[in-house]
């Protein structure tokens, strides 16, 4: 067994998976929560629709680097490996932030939001502003990658969980406090999402320092090798991010498109956390490879986890669950 690697057991796998699970849930569930801040603004639910579409484009762009965390979990286990991973993360961040800024410019913004998604000019502007100022959020996600990889590789589940819980709690506090002080609308909604992510990144950096100092020297793959490893891992996240955009292009042409899109994104707020959580099983498979030919213990763990995750959308499809979702 590789030095420093934890042997597989259901408890070890669950302990490793829970921070990934919590992060996936927080990354998706916090967005519907912030809908309360946005929809209480002057444009009501229409602003929530435009805001959500701006976020969808952001996630599509970010998904092009969706495999970075897993790449770091494979290659960033030595000082030199972490250094190469940090450079790769920085390069991909710079390129994708530039792409995000470019998409906000004319004529791309009008083509995407006006032509493809069928938004009127006012809602197109809200979506464009959301996408543009989400560059800060996107940068925070990338900056978080490096310390999160260090924590995951060190099996520091407590610290990783603490960072994510702090993000959820701060988001919840904003959702309650902002409307009380009249701080509503898309711009304040974006603040309510972005500031907690920055907090999560800063806490991750703080907790990761002691584990980074413990890394040993050793060989490392080049940036290009790590990039080639990242691309196929990003494919699943990319498909997951593209599907809401494709669906929105059809929903936006239905009767009462703004209302229909708002319902669409509330529903995605339930489905997406489950999908992202299931996708994180890739990281568990990387961290706990088979220890002998025919070792299927992780397969059984994945099946049980998948069944438990599937219960969540099922419960919301029941009459009582529908009432809760509507409320």
Segments the model singles out, each with a brief description of its role:
Residues 48-100, 144-153, 261-311:
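Small-residue-rich hydrophobic transmembrane alpha-helices
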Residues 66-73, 133-152, 163-168, 189-205, ...:
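Short runs within selected transmembrane alpha-helices of multi-pass transporters and secretion channels
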Residues 168-201, 316-327:
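Membrane-interface helix-loop junctions in multi-pass transport and translocation proteins
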Residues 1-18, 125-126, 186-194, 199-241:
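Interhelical loop/hinge segments that connect adjacent transmembrane helices in multipass membrane
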Residues 98-128, 309-327:
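Short membrane-interface helical motifs at transmembrane helix boundaries
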Residues 16-24, 59, 134, 160, ...:
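Residue-level signature of transmembrane alpha-helical cores of multipass secondary-active transporters
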Residues 12, 16, 35-59, 122-126, ...:
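Interfacial/gating helices of multi-pass transporter permease domains
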Residues 121-147, 270, 274, 327:
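Alpha-helical transmembrane segments of multi-pass membrane proteins
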């Amino acid at each position: 067994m590789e030095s420093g690697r934890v042997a597989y057991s259901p408890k070890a796998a669950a302990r490793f998976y829970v921070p990934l699970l919590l992060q996936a849930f927080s990354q998706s569930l916090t967005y519907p929560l912030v809908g309360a801040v946005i929809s209480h603004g002057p444009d009501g639910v229409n602003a929530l629709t435009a805001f959500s579409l701006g976020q969808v484009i952001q996630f599509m762009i970010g998904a092009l680097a969706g495999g970075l965390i897993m790449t770091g979990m494979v290659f960033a286990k030595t000082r030199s490996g972490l250094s190469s991973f940090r450079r790769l993360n920085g390069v991909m961040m710079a390129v994708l932030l530039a792409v995000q800024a470019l998409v906000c410019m004319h004529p791309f913004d009008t083509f995407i939001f006006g032509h493809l998604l069928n938004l009127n000019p006012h809602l197109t502007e809200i979506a464009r502003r959301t996408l543009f100022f989400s560059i800060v959020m996107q940068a925070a996600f990338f900056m978080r990658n490096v310390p999160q990889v260090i924590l995951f590789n060190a099996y520091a589940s407590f610290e990783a969980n603490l960072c994510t819980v702090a993000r959820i709690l701060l988001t919840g506090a904003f959702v309650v406090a902002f409307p009380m002080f009249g701080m509503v609308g898309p711009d304040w909604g974006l603040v309510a999402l972005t500031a907690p992510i920055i907090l999560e990144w800063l806490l991750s950096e703080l907790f990761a320092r002691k584990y980074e100092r413990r890394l040993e020297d050793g060989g490392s793959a080049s940036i290009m090798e790590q990039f080639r490893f990242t691309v196929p891992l990003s494919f699943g996240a990319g498909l997951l991010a593209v599907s809401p955009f494709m669906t929105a292009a059809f929903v936006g042409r239905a009767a009462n498109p703004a209302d229909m899109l708002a319902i669409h994104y509330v529903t995605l707020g339930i489905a997406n956390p489950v999908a992202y959580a299931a996708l994180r099983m890739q990281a568990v498979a990387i961290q706990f490879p088979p220890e002998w030919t025919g070792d299927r213990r992780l397969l059984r763990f994945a099946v049980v986890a998948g069944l438990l995750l599937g219960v969540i959308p099922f419960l919301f499809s029941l009459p009582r669950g529908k009432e809760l979702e509507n409320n």
